[in-house]
Amino acid sequence: SDRTGIDPCNTLIQLNEFDERTRSLIGNRLFNICCLVFNPSSSSEYSQFQFLKPSYRVSRLSQIGSDFCRALLSDVFNLPIRKALGARFDWVFEFSKISDVISNAPYNEVLDILWYTCSWISRYTTAEFSNEMYKALNSLFEEEYVGYRFIAGEIVPITDKSEAVEIEQACHTPFDGARTQLQKALCFLSDREHPDYKNCVKESISAVESVCKVISGNEKAALKDALNGLIANGMNIHG
């Protein structure tokens, strides 16, 4: 508060630049997430067995943090790896490289390394843990007026909470074709340097078309024909 000499929270949407406070909070939250996965003894509330996928609970239990470091140094920082496959990396030590990016790099690199880390963790953890991880980061984004959200594992530019909820729900449609096309649309949108709006819209329309074909029972129908078929059957498509 002003009374204690602390500036009030940022109230401007942060899209192309993140302030120092936001960067610190992102780094802290990501470090806490890594602690839960790579160093579960740091928290008495969680057991690593609870949120690791069953196939990794034995083979990866003692080395998952080291495996992450090896992937991070090679895939993200493009550094030569000079440790044998069985050698261990200290994830807390290597996290300093992530911290440096979050503290000093352009906004898009901050989001890239955040996405990479969460995506890697998501591959080894249960859906429940991954959902809670993304929810925690989205809450931080909302609190700090960051104009991005994690949606279906991608970071996309969006500021309205209701829009984020709608897109997230759409990405979990039971229709396989539509779900795949919406995921592609999000990937096109999530490219922060060169977002491909044209193909994003194209895939989104294709997703709508896929659902309409299934509902109308006509797999060969074009979007217009499928919509007309739904209307003829009494469906209100305008809300």
How would you name each of these model-derived features?
Residues G27, N32-T180:
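Internal, Lys/Arg-enriched amphipathic helical interaction segments that engage polyanionic partners
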